C-alpha cells in the first residue's frame, strides 16, 4: 500500500489487547536495523528477550523460554542482531523521562536514535483527563520526532467494545481518544488463526482505508 514509517514523523499502531502490537513493533525495530531507542513500559524485559530470540532464531517462544530457564547463556549470539537497539523498561515513563533518555542516548552514541518506539501511549499519558492527556502526549511526541529527526513509533489501544469483523482490522474511529490528527501514519492490527492483519487507516502520504476493512495479512 505504499506505506513508509518516516523520520521526523509520528506513527501510531493501535489494536486490542493481545492483537500483536508489541510483536509488530519489535519486528520493525529488528528488521529495520537502524539506531533504535525502545521504551518498553508494557512488557517485561524477560518477555522481550524471549520474543526477540524467537524472532531471530525462528524457534518457538515456548521452546526459547525453556532453554533460557535451563541455560542463561542460551541465545547470546542472537543478541548480536539487537545491538542497534537500546532499551528502557521503566513501567511508567513521563515525557521528561523520555526526553532525558533521548538526550542520554545522543550523548553516549554521538547521534540521536533514528527510531523511537513507545510501548505504549497509555503508560506515558497521565493526568485526570485521560483523553486530553493522550492528545497532549501525542503533541509532545510529534515535537520529539521533528526535533530529533527520528521516526517515533507509538503503540496504542482501540476500544474493546469495538467488534472486529472477520477479515478486517479495527477502524480508525475505534482508537481510544479518537484523535488521529497528529500522526502522519496510523495502522490498526488484528490477528486471526496465526495471521496478523495490518490496516492503514490514516496515511498523510498515500492511500488508506479508515474502515480497517483492507488489511494486509502476515504470518507471525
Please state what every model-predicted region is.
Residues 18, 136-220:
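Phosphate-binding/switch region of NTP-binding enzymes
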Residues 1-59, 179:
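The Walker A/P-loop phosphate-binding site
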Residues 32, 109, 147-148:
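Helix C-cap/helix->beta junction micro-motif
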Residues 14, 26-29, 49, 53, ...:
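Generic hydrophobic alpha-helical scaffold/packing signal
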Residues 11-13, 37-39, 88, 153, ...:
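Hydrophobic/aromatic beta-strand patches that form the interior of the parallel beta-sheet core
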Residues 1-7, 78-82, 144, 208-214:
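Core recognition of P-loop NTPase motor domains used across DNA-transaction enzymes
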Residues 20-21, 44-48, 95, 123-127, ...:
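Flexible loop/turn segments at secondary-structure boundaries
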Residues 36-129:
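Conserved inter-motif catalytic segment of the P-loop NTP-binding fold
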Amino acid at each position: 500500500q505504499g506505506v513508509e514509517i518516516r523520520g521526523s514523523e509520528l506513527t501510531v499502531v493501535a489494536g486490542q489487547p493481545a492483537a500483536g502490537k508489541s510483536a509488530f513493533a519489535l519486528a520493525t525495530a529488528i528488521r529495520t536495523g537502524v539506531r533504535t531507542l525502545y521504551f518498553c513500559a508494557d512488557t517485561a524485559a524477560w518477555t522481550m528477550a524471549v520474543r526477540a530470540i524467537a524472532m531471530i532464531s525462528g524457534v518457538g517462544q515456548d521452546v526459547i523460554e525453556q532453554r533460557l530457564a535451563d541455560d542463561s547463556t542460551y541465545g547470546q549470539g542472537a543478541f548480536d542482531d539487537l545491538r542497534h537497539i537500546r532499551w528502557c523498561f521503566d513501567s511508567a515513563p513521563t515525557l521528561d523521562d523520555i526526553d532525558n533518555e533521548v538526550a542520554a542516548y545522543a550523548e553516549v552514541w554521538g547521534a540521536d536514535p533514528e527510531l523511537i518506539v513507545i510501548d505504549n501511549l497509555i503508560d506515558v499519558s497521565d493526568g485526570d483527563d485521560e483523553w486530553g492527556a493522550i492528545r497532549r502526549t501525542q503533541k509532545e511526541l510529534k515535537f520529539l520526532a521533528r526535533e530529533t529527526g527520528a521516526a517515533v513509533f507509538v503503540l496504542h489501544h482501540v476500544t474493546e467494545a469495538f467488534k472486529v469483523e472477520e477479515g478486517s482490522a479495527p477502524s480508525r474511529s475505534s482508537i481510544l481518544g479518537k484523535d488521529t490528527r497528529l500522526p502522519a501514519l496510523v495502522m490498526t492490527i488484528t490477528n486471526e488463526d496465526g495471521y496478523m492483519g495490518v490496516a492503514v487507516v490514516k496515511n498523510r502520504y498515500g492511500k488508506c482505508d479508515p474502515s480497517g476493512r483492507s488489511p494486509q495479512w502476515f504470518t507471525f
